Amino acid sequence: MFANAGAMAFGGMTGSSRMAQSPRFSMWRPQSLDADGVAQYELADLRAFSRDLERTAPVATGAISTRSSYIVAAGINLQSRIDAEELGLTDDQASAWQSFTERRFSMWAESPFADVHGELNFYEQQELALRSHDVSGDSFVLLAGKSRQGWPFRLATQIIEADRVSNPNGRMNAGTLVDGIERAIDGEPFRAHVAKYHPGKIIPGSANEWTPIDFLSASGRRNLLHLKKIKRPGQTRGLPILDPIIATIKQLTRYSDAEVDAAVNSAALALFVTMDAEAYTDILSYEEKTYRDKKAAEWDGVINSGKAINLMPGESVSSPTPGRPNPNFDPFFGAMLNICSIGLNMPKEILAKAFNASYSASRAALMDAWRTWKIERTWLARRMCQPIYEEWLADAVALGIIDAPGFFSDPFIRAAWCRSSWCGDGPGALDPLKEATAAEKRIEIGQTTLAEEIVAYDGGDWEQKHRQRAREVRDRERDGLQVPVGTKAPTSKPLSQQEKPDQSDDPEDPEDPDSSQLQLSLA
């Protein structure tokens, strides 16, 4: 057995040596570093590159904006789903508590007072936190207490950019301190060092200061949330999502800019005037010749449309046929977009905003992207939305705004009160009629419920839509308007108190089909 193990080890070393000696790998010498070692040497540059591309490169800007538009959209909304059985509540009591809590939370979430700076509401902070995470690699959310005159809640949050969390005074990573994050002996992150200013902010006469903030307080309350994707064991900081394709996007941007410049130059119309050498010497004075020589030397070669350009004696202009627009530009650019879309885990149709294929192909691309976005939305809800809601609920219970018996005395009861789901906008519909028909069929065969279809469509609340729909039907019937097809008018009395339909006109048919009008059916 040991002989075989030795042979395997020797064979592995031999294989490694062959690869190292191969000409194909002569320039490829990656270092085997731990997760933090890679970030230590490259993270600052990666953030700078990523931010510059997000600001100046259309492909990067579109990718980042598309993610936030679908993952967060108008906002990830709370749907309280308490454990009524654990709490000993009836369904009606649970529903009433959930509705009341959702209204109070909505009041807080829709107000800019949810922000420490009073600028962004909770849903706008979701978008900012995700965007900052995507561009910088990670982001932080500070959960602070701030009292305001006439405002019943104390919780306020603040998004902290990744660069502000760093080692104090530029200290090197050592021991348990890595890139501004302190870990305990067992490896658990327990503290972040947050700089007062962004390292790129220059304030004359002011030195930067770092404040240590524990992720959890002594009482177990959350002080700081760290939004990051862990791709390797022991990874302390996250990497920008553009990391695999930074060089590709930059080169693609340069290529597209060069093609645009070439097309503009080929479209420009300019006149070149050639002067006779003898006339140039005889007619012009020494001062004027000196001036013209100087201006000619300063010409940068830029051709403006409709411009007349004087050439010096003996000069001529020859220009090759530019061949612009380049017929090969679109196929090449599309092929490069394919590479970028793979690196971003986003279908090319979504990245390019071009649904030129068939309905089936376009829908397949949208559904493929939607699976990724659902995972990302769930991650953001678990890492940011739910922890913030739990802290808000604890504060509201402590202030007497929300009644939740046993909230602070029993962790199981507290968990039952905090149960919730988070919903956002749906992916949209390429063909609304086809997709509505499919949803109707799923409900009919029992594959899904009406509530599930509403959540998947636009993240709405079935109970709210049901109540609103019932009011609409009653009001239309009251005002003499036609009730929409497929909707039965609601009754004003319970079925048990209504008179049975008169069947005397049709004794052979005891089941009057008009009796279905007594039932409320909301499609």
Regions inferred by a protein language model and the residue ranges of each:
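Structured, mid-chain assembly/scaffold modules that mediate subunit interfaces
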Residues: 70-230, 442
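Surface-exposed loop-to-helix/strand elements on domain peripheries
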Residues: 95, 116, 307-430
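Intrinsically disordered or highly flexible coil/loop and linker segments, enriched in small
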Residues: 114, 135, 139, 233, ...
